[in-house]
């Protein structure tokens, strides 16, 4: 998919760069594969803000995407490619030979009419699913499982992928986009190919209103707040905060490591922080 630029008829149009979605299906999603989605506005069940600067935006319908691909050795044909407001990647509607339909993440170079298959040993082509232990070294994959049978968790965003770089007994070594290398069990599955819509990184929203359509509210800095609202707040006139940058809850920001899951550290061979100078 290419990028679209617009004639500068307004200030917002002048800056706007969008992904050309003309090749995607223009109708509504399959009703049986959708769910209603409640707009939480960044609040949790007690009504308190847990994610700041969220709210408003266009009403969305959730598309149920199959991250597990448990229909083994049953071919499916790609019926159409669709836009999904809940994620940056595009999704594909597939129809199995038994007549059931499902949505999957659309990989790059997947076209309408292609056949995809999940199994222990399948062809290495975009959209096919197989255990990591059965893939050749160097394979580009996405939607990678971390726990056997849980469904894909890694490399699901637009344009992302992971690469199989080695084997270690029952495990394989996977290199992620961040530079991290980690061990994943060979029986965990992954989908072959990179995720669709790689041009997502090059879009320009163009105007504040388009951010509001996406449900993003203005992000205001701590130094502009009052002391009751933020550790950086207060002061006479404009101040620089007067302390090392912290979150509204007083925890150091700007890159301090917060990972505390020590039990899974053994699976990380090369940290993503190692490549930062």
Curated annotation (Swiss-Prot):
Keywords: Ribonucleoprotein, Ribosomal protein, RNA-binding, rRNA-binding. GO terms for molecular function: rRNA binding; structural constituent of ribosome; transferase activity. GO terms for cellular component: large ribosomal subunit. GO terms for biological process: cytoplasmic translation. SMART domains: Ribosomal_L2, Ribosomal_L2_C. The keyword Ribonucleoprotein applies. Disulfide bonds: none annotated. Residues 222-277 are annotated as: Disordered. Part of the 50S ribosomal subunit. Forms a bridge to the 30S subunit in the 70S ribosome. NCBIfam families: rplB_bact. Belongs to the universal ribosomal protein uL2 family. One of the primary rRNA binding proteins. Required for association of the 30S and 50S subunits to form the 70S ribosome, for tRNA binding and peptide bond formation. It has been suggested to have peptidyltransferase activity; this is somewhat controversial. Makes several contacts with the 16S rRNA in the 70S ribosome. This is Large ribosomal subunit protein uL2. It comes from Rhodopseudomonas palustris (strain BisB18). The lineage of its organism: Bacteria, Pseudomonadati, Pseudomonadota, Alphaproteobacteria, Hyphomicrobiales. The gene is rplB.
